[in-house]
């Protein structure tokens, strides 16, 4: 989820549910197909000549019976992992029975020419971020990343022109919730695990922050569209933020290649003690080396100048540090233990965004109090719902409707006016332009960086 600049403040910039697992071992269940005893039947005619024969038959019968009774007990079959459904709805806990989730792409740090040591303030900040070396924390974060990979894989394979954006968004939302095993319908459940922010489906010149909401006319995906798919997955407030772009016409291939290359350049450059300005320069150099021909006209791919990547904090998608896509003089450094969403946006337009009409979503201000005293009862009730279900995680009207809320817009406007809730608008470039986005979450660990959301797709 991109951070529009300038920032308001700061640096500019499992419970796992387990269900029954089928284990088709084949054959009939134990106890349903037992062999009979091998005992022979002895006749009543006590003929002396048959005595020896009867005696032999009895011995043989008993021997056969004893052999049959010495059956080997069947070994219990091991519990087999379930297979993912289509659409994805099987919780990850049923797919990874050992509870261990895949590690992301591990990259070594590039040599740091300056190699400056941490200041005392940086050391203090690092101590508050030592969780990046905690196995339990990492496993949960990797689980969230695996949820993202599985949901986006299905999206890339199944979404086609002719579908409405509302259907696509709800399929992604439902997939994330199902794989996490948290429906998010009870107070506090979506704070344990859920969506990191509203699923973004931004078309063409809409660069970022569009999601279908109730009351809007549904938009139908066209074969000529360029769609940015940006969604987040969190467990215990730690968000995996990753995005990709879908097209259905090869004419846009160079646009996508430019943005993907720029994102990878940013990931390669990022590291401990690296200046953000150096990451920005690498992104712009890669991005603007491309051009794209559309309708017989050639367009340079421009890095969008007033939206940025960002660091991620606990329950906070935009942590205060920004990573622009153009050269700048920012001497701020990335630090050990930080988490960054390295994303890039490229456009065939002006490369400059502005707020469009409408609302993408809302988010409780990070410095807002736990309780507010407002005259409007609906505002107080809505604020309680926000605290119980979202905290500081960004949400949208679609999520409020899902909880069964009605007639809440007046209360929401009151919360926005009093500065306790922020409102986010769609971000657009000039009409007729096309834009693309790719994004990954990277953990700056002590000995290496882990691109935790990396997959086979991008």
Swiss-Prot record:
Its EC number is 3.4.11.18. Belongs to the peptidase M24A family. Methionine aminopeptidase eukaryotic type 2 subfamily. Cotranslationally removes the N-terminal methionine from nascent proteins. The N-terminal methionine is often cleaved when the second residue in the primary sequence is small and uncharged (Met-Ala-, Cys, Gly, Pro, Ser, Thr, or Val). A divalent metal cation 2 binds at residues 241, 310, 343, 439. Binds 2 divalent metal cations per subunit. Has a high-affinity and a low affinity metal-binding site. The true nature of the physiological cofactor is under debate. The enzyme is active with cobalt, zinc, manganese or divalent iron ions. Most likely, methionine aminopeptidases function as mononuclear Fe(2+)-metalloproteases under physiological conditions, and the catalytically relevant metal-binding site has been assigned to the histidine-containing high-affinity site. InterPro entries: Creatinase/aminopeptidase-like, Met_Aminopeptidase_Type2, Pept_M24, Pept_M24_MAP, Pept_M24A_MAP2, Pept_M24A_MAP2_BS, WH-like_DNA-bd_sf, WH_DNA-bd_sf. One of its GO terms (cellular component) is cytoplasm. It comes from Emericella nidulans (strain FGSC A4 / ATCC 38163 / CBS 112.46 / NRRL 194 / M139). GO terms for biological process: proteolysis. Its cofactor is Co(2+); Zn(2+); Mn(2+); Fe(2+). Signal peptide: none annotated. Keywords: Aminopeptidase, Cytoplasm, Hydrolase, Metal-binding, Protease. A divalent metal cation 1 binds at residues 230, 241, 439. It is found in: Cytoplasm. It catalyses: Release of N-terminal amino acids, preferentially methionine, from peptides and arylamides. Residues 67-82 have a biased composition (Basic residues). This is Methionine aminopeptidase 2-2. The keyword Cytoplasm applies. Residues 1-14 have a biased composition (Basic and acidic residues). It holds the Pfam family Peptidase_M24. GO terms for molecular function: aminopeptidase activity; initiator methionyl aminopeptidase activity; metal ion binding; metalloaminopeptidase activity; metalloexopeptidase activity.
